[in-house]
C-alpha cells in the first residue's frame, strides 16, 4: 500500500515522503497512529501544493535576505564608549551592542546571533562585522568605535 508519511518513521522514511508499506503495517500501525495517510490522488495533490508553497516561501526569504545584504553592505555604525588614554575600552563591545546600534541608527532589526564579531573588540578603531542572513547569504558592514 502506498502511503504519505506525516512525520519521520524510523526504518521507513522521512516526513512528506511517499513510500510503499505492507498493507497490515499501514492499516494497523501507520494510519491509526496518524503517522501516515493513504496515497490517494487528492492527498498526493495536497502534498504537491504544500511543497510548492514551501518552495515559494523559501524563494521569498532568499530574495529578502539578498535585498537586506545589499542594504547592509554600505552601512557604517558608530558606537561611542568610554576608553582609557591608550585607546583601550573599559569592557568590550559585544554583538548585542552592535545589534542595538543597528536598530537605533539604521532602523534595521537584526538578531545578535546572526552577527559574527571579530574575536575581541576591546579598543577604539574600525572593525568589519559579518552578518549571516541566510545559509550562503552573508554581508559585512563597518563598526566604528570612538571615545566619548
UniProtKB/Swiss-Prot annotation:
Pfam families: Ribosomal_L9_C, Ribosomal_L9_N. Gene3D superfamilies: Ribosomal protein L9, C-terminal domain, Ribosomal protein L9, N-terminal domain. The keyword RNA-binding applies. GO terms for biological process: translation. Coiled coil: none annotated. Keywords: Ribonucleoprotein, Ribosomal protein, RNA-binding, rRNA-binding. GO terms for molecular function: rRNA binding; structural constituent of ribosome. One of its GO terms (cellular component) is ribosome. PANTHER family: 50S RIBOSOMAL PROTEIN L9 (PTHR21368). Belongs to the bacterial ribosomal protein bL9 family. Binds to the 23S rRNA. This is Large ribosomal subunit protein bL9.
Amino acid at each position: 500500500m502506498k502511503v504519505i508519511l506525516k512525520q519521520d518513521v524510523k526504518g521507513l522514511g522521512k516526513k512528506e515522503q511517499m513510500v510503499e508499506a505492507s498493507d497490515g503495517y499501514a492499516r494497523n500501525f501507520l494510519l491509526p497512529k496518524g503517522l501516515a495517510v493513504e496515497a490517494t490522488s487528492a492527498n498526493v495533490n495536497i502534498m504537491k501544493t504544500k511543497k510548492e508553497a514551501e518552495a515559494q516561501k523559501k524563494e521569498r526569504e532568499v530574495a529578502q535576505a539578498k535585498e537586506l545584504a545589499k542594504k547592509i553592505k554600505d552601512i557604517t555604525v558608530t558606537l561611542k564608549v568610554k576608553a582609557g588614554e591608550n585607546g583601550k575600552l573599559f569592557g568590550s563591545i559585544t554583538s548585542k551592542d552592535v545589534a542595538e546600534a543597528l536598530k537605533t541608527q539604521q532602523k534595521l532589526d537584526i538578531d545578535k546571533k546572526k552577527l559574527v564579531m571579530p574575536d575581541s573588540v576591546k579598543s577604539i578603531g574600525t572593525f568589519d562585522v559579518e552578518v549571516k542572513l541566510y545559509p550562503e547569504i552573508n554581508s559585512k558592514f563597518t563598526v566604528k568605535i570612538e571615545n566619548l
